[in-house]
Amino acid sequence: MALTTERVKLFFEWFLFFGAIFIAITILYILLVLLFEVPRYIKELVRCLVEYLTRRRVWMQRTQLTEATGDVEIGRGIVEDRRDQEPAVIPHVSQVIPSQPNRRDDQGRRGNAGPMF
């Protein structure tokens, strides 16, 4: 009877030991996930906050301008998005490469073995 009690005690000691190791590994894993994932969420949150504040500032400027002038059309001239503030790239004529369509007489010189219709 005493031998069985010792075995049960030993079993529970080992069970608690491995359980404690499992819990410690789980806690370390959670801490590592928090260490690497929370900065991403904070970065995304800051980006959304800045975008919201920028849109709100533009909206307030537009509203104040409309109230000051009484003209609704003036408020539409304010740029709503930063992407609109970038200068447009317009290619010069020298940068444009004209496309040359393939003529029928060119097809024979290209070594094309297909039928010519």
From Swiss-Prot:
InterPro entries: MP
Subcellular location: Host cell membrane
Major subcellular site: host cell
Cytoplasm keyword on record: no
Transmembrane segments: 15-35
Region feature (Disordered): 83-117
GO cellular component labels: host cell plasma membrane; membrane
UniProt keyword list: Host cell membrane, Host membrane, Host-virus interaction, Inhibition of host innate immune response by virus, Membrane, Suppressor of RNA silencing, Transmembrane, Transmembrane helix, Transport, Viral immunoevasion, Viral movement protein
Biological process according to GO: symbiont-mediated cell-to-cell migration in host; symbiont-mediated suppression of host innate immune response; transport of virus in host, cell to cell
Pfam families referenced in this protein's UniProt entry, alphabetically: Babuvirus_MP (PF07234)
Membrane topology according to the record: Single-pass membrane protein
Main function: Transports viral genome to neighboring plant cells directly through plasmosdesmata, without any budding. The movement protein allows efficient cell to cell propagation, by bypassing the host cell wall barrier. Begomovirus genome is shuttled out of nucleus by Nuclear shuttle protein (NSP) and the movement protein transports the DNA-NSP complex to cell plasmodesmata and facilitates further movement across the cell wall.
Protein name per the record: Movement and RNA silencing protein
Native source organism of the sequence: Banana bunchy top virus (isolate Autralia) (BBTV)
Classification of source organism: Viruses, Monodnaviria, Shotokuvirae, Cressdnaviricota, Arfiviricetes
